[in-house]
């Protein structure tokens, strides 16, 4: 199916979501097999994690959830806009324990542009530094007075 999509549509990007209890590592292996014969580059492995359910999912879905977290190059936390700092920090700690090298996006995704999310997924931007720079620039005139 992936080969047909690539050859028919020539997409710039293909997103594959391992639904249900699929493993990210299995999806990655399958795509790597197809990539041997097609112009396909695996450049990011992203997991979206609900900040309110990380602990519960680790407990209830164990191997499958841990596989998605441990094989991700980027983990985007959802529902952070209404979560406390403590809840976000606890989720980050649990995720970082399973995958200390992944970029973990904690910014409420409703304030991020699609381009910012793609850049972070691709490992091309330091979103924290960028948002801090924007915040400083927005408050700079207020500090002068």
Regions of interest found by a model, annotated:
Residues 60-63:
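Charged helix-capping and loop-helix junction motifs
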Residues 35, 76-80:
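Short amphipathic alpha-helical interaction patches enriched in hydrophobic/aromatic residues
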Residues 20-23, 51-55, 80-84, 109-113:
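Conserved nucleotide-binding/hydrolysis micro-motifs of P-loop NTPases
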Residues 45, 75-76:
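Short, well-ordered beta-strand core segments
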Residues 1-58:
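Nucleotide-state-sensitive switch-loop elements of NTP-binding domains
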Residues 67, 71-74, 82-145:
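C-terminal accessory "lid"/substrate-recognition subdomains
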């Amino acid at each position: 199916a992936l080969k047909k999509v690539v050859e028919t549509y020539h997409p710039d990007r293909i997103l594959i979501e391992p639904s249900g209890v699929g493993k990210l590592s299995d999806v990655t292996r399958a795509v790597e097999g197809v990539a041997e014969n097609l112009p396909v580059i695996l450049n990011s492995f992203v997991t979206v994690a609900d900040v309110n359910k990380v602990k519960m999912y680790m407990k209830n879905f164990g191997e499958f959830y841990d596989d998605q977290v441990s094989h991700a190059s980027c983990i985007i936390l959802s529902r952070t806009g209404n979560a406390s700092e403590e809840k976000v920090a606890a989720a980050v700690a649990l995720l970082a324990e399973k995958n200390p090298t992944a970029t973990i996006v904690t910014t409420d995704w409703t304030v991020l542009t699609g381009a910012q999310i793609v850049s972070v997924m691709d490992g091309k931007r330091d979103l924290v530094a960028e948002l801090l720079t924007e915040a400083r620039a927005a408050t700079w005139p207020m500090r002068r007075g």
